[in-house]
Amino acid sequence: MTFKLFVVVTLVLAIYVATAEEAMKDDSEPAERGCIKYGDRCGSPHGLPSNCCNDWKYKGRCGCTMGVCTCGPNCPSRGCDWSKKG
């Protein structure tokens, strides 16, 4: 009985740790959780929010332009890869 309890507790801990590691990966941009990635649809034409993701690794700006998250100098929020400028 003690061995079975040990196995169950070990499995539960393993699942908990694996889930926590996934959550830590998602926290790389905590302020941008739920934001829309570059190239995805956004804005009122699609009935979606306009909050495009900021990517602090790149210079430039990113925003919702004509219903798609694109990069450009006049977009409202910082951070986009200029090589993917829309």
Swiss-Prot record:
Cysteines paired by S-S bonds: C35-C53, C42-C62, C52-C71, C64-C69
Keywords, ordered alphabetically: Disulfide bond, Ion channel impairing toxin, Knottin, Neurotoxin, Secreted, Signal, Toxin, Voltage-gated sodium channel impairing toxin
Tissue: Expressed by the venom gland.
Signal sequence segment: 1-20
Recorded GO CC terms: extracellular region
Positions of the propeptide segment: 21-33
GO molecular function term, any single one: sodium channel regulator activity
Subcellular location: Secreted
Domain characteristics, as noted in the entry: The presence of a 'disulfide through disulfide knot' structurally defines this protein as a knottin.
Function field: Toxin active against S.frugiperda larvae. May act on sodium channels (Nav).
Similarity comment: family membership: Belongs to the neurotoxin 39 family.
Protein name: U2-sicaritoxin-Li1a
Record organism: Loxosceles intermedia (Brown spider)
